[in-house]
A protein has these predicted regions:
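C-terminal terminal-subdomain/extension
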Residues: 270-326
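Soluble catalytic domains of membrane acyltransferases
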Residues: 94-294
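Intrinsically disordered, low-complexity mixed-charge segments
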Residues: 1
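Membrane-anchoring hydrophobic helices of lipid-metabolizing enzymes
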Residues: 4-134, 138-173, 242, 315-326
Length: 326
């Protein structure tokens, strides 16, 4: 059983420290002939950190080495780039994070859905993997588009890659246009507050932000699908945040993790944590009256019910997971 947010922070940080110490030792001493000191943790001994990191670096390094097809939709998604990235996404989902996904069989495949999940860090690995999981389960449907924070989509080095893989700037207008044209959407209503959670606050959902995306679902009668994602928050565990240097480069905060900036660019790679994704029963919206959008009390109730369901799914996933590493 995963220790989760309700147990000893000291014990959880000690496991994280052991794992990262083992990871740093293997990376820095790849060419050394000295015998390695084993970490006394079964799940760490079974996982080959060095091989996983080397393969991940190779796969990330091969991205973008293909000409664009020119067949790009209005939001920038490129089928050629997406096809080229599927092997990497399969590797991340099946081998690197060993993601267990449940509940997708209850999803309506006949119309667009709004998937609403807990936010898991600055980089949108959660949206990428959830989108990939839904597409694999429903291969005849369009790939869901995942909403990305505005500040991240404005970074010149990030925006093209995210857009090519289905990332869309998070705003009500984009969500409405996608749902109206039959595309499912993945949203993270915690916003920056959720992305900025430090390690001690992991898996405790923050208050949802403005309800623009959920209003778009109401307008389009798209079911709200709660999703709990566990594993992504430990992939880049934030120990603390530095605000001053972040503002200088246009970021909401600069995360300090056990590997970044200590390992330099290598520290930007995510850790091979164990992921569990639980998709809950959709919340249908067809029965809500025409005036639901103007009823703030009703809307607040729907949003709070959605948040509670996501927190329950996260807690269930933590109960199921043996540890952050598998």
């Amino acid at each position: 059983m995963d220790s989760g947010p309700g147990t000893s922070e000291h014990d959880e940080l000690e496991v994280l420290h052991l794992a990262l110490s083992d990871l740093r030792r293997k990376i820095r001493s790849r060419s050394s002939t000295r015998p390695e000191t084993r970490v006394d943790n079964e799940s760490l001994r079974e996982f080959d950190w060095q091989a996983a990191f080397n393969e991940l670096r190779h796969r990330f390094g091969s991205l973008g080495m293909v000409e664009r097809s020119g067949e790009v939709d209005e939001f920038g998604m490129d089928d050629v780039s997406l096809d080229r990235s599927r092997m990497l996404l399969d590797f991340l989902m099946d081998r690197y994070w060993r993601a267990e996904v449940s509940g997708l069989d209850a999803i309506d495949s006949g119309g667009p859905n709004l998937f609403v999940a807990n936010c898991s860090g600055l980089l949108p690995y959660d949206g990428l993997i959830l989108s990939h999981a839904v597409e694999r389960w429903h291969p005849t449907r369009d790939r869901p588009r995942f909403l990305v924070a505005d500040w991240l989509m404005t970074l010149p080095f990030a925006q093209p890659y995210l857009a090519q893989l289905g990332g869309v700037r998070a705003c009500r207008e984009n969500a409405d246009r996608l749902l109206r044209t039959g595309h499912s959407v993945i949203a993270f209503p915690e916003g920056v507050r959720g992305a900025a959670k430090v390690f001690a606050e992991r898996y405790r959902l923050k208050r949802f932000g403005r309800s623009g995306v959920i209003r778009a679902a109401l307008e389009n009668r798209a079911p709200l699908v709660p999703v709990g994602i566990v594993g992504a928050e430990e992939a880049h565990p934030i120990l603390f945040k530095a605000d001053l240097p972040a503002r200088a480069i246009g970021l909401p905060f600069a995360p300090v993790t056990p590997t970044f900036p200590l390992l330099g660019p290598l520290g930007l790679l995510p850790l091979p944590t164990k992921w569990i994704i639980r998709v809950g029963e959709p919340i249908p919206l067809e029965d809500l009256g025409a005036g639901a959008l103007d009823d703030e009390s009703l809307l607040s109730g729907v949003i709070e019910e959605l948040r509670e369901r996501i927190q329950e799914l996260v807690s269930e996933a933590l109960e199921r997971r043996a540890s952050a590493w598998g």
